[in-house]
């Protein structure tokens, strides 16, 4: 339990390596393949359930691993009503124990895309509500911590950014983020680093 704090470490405080775009696409496709093979949304699954058999044959998982993978997909589908993929993005909103609103966008695009998307959304929300908010991103989605007074129809979250303005919004967000200065210094240090001796010279 985060006790009112952001649920994960904000991504600009400790950037971890993100999944590649290719791996993110394959993970999302695997989830989609499992979801399409579901016959019954009830757990526990019988050993002969179609997605379990498929995972054992195609992905070389053992029985328990295949069942856990399918149960993971079932649990998410039970809560969200669908399985988030790169073709089906799900927005979810709930109030935490402290009364703050959490907006979660389930989008398995990988950390690189989700960090950029999260920064741009954070900037848009800050401008729209005149309120500094926390954002965190993972390989599987984005979390925005909003106040209890910030209300909007959930489906409008996808209209906060569009292809015409996203570059400008993201540029403004990155320039104001501590991540920009940290990365700038890191890159400048690496660019100026000279080896003392190379081949005896």
Predicted features along the sequence, with ranges:
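C-terminal effector modules of nucleic-acid-centric enzymes and ribosome-associated factors
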Residues: 1-201
């Amino acid at each position: 339990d985060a006790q009112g704090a952001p649920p994960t470490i904000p991504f600009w405080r400790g950037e971890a390596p993100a999944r590649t775009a290719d791996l993110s696409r394959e993970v999302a496709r695997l989830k989609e393949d499992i979801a399409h093979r579901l016959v019954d949304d009830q757990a526990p699954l019988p050993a002969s359930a179609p997605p379990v058999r498929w995972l054992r044959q195609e992905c070389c998982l053992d029985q328990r691993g295949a069942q856990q993978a399918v149960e993971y997909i079932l649990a998410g589908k039970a809560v969200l009503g669908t399985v988030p993929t790169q073709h089906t993005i799900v927005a979810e909103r709930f109030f935490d124990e402290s009364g703050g609103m959490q907006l979660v966008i389930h989008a398995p695009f990988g950390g690189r895309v989700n960090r950029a998307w999260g920064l741009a959304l954070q900037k848009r929300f800050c401008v729209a509500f005149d309120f500094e908010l926390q954002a965190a991103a993972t390989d599987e989605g984005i979390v925005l911590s909003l106040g209890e007074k910030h209300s909007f129809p959930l489906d409008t979250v996808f209209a906060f950014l569009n292809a015409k303005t996203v570059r400008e919004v993201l540029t403004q967000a990155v320039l104001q983020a501590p991540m920009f200065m940290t990365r700038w210094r890191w890159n400048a240090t690496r660019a100026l680093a000279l080896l003392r001796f190379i081949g005896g010279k």
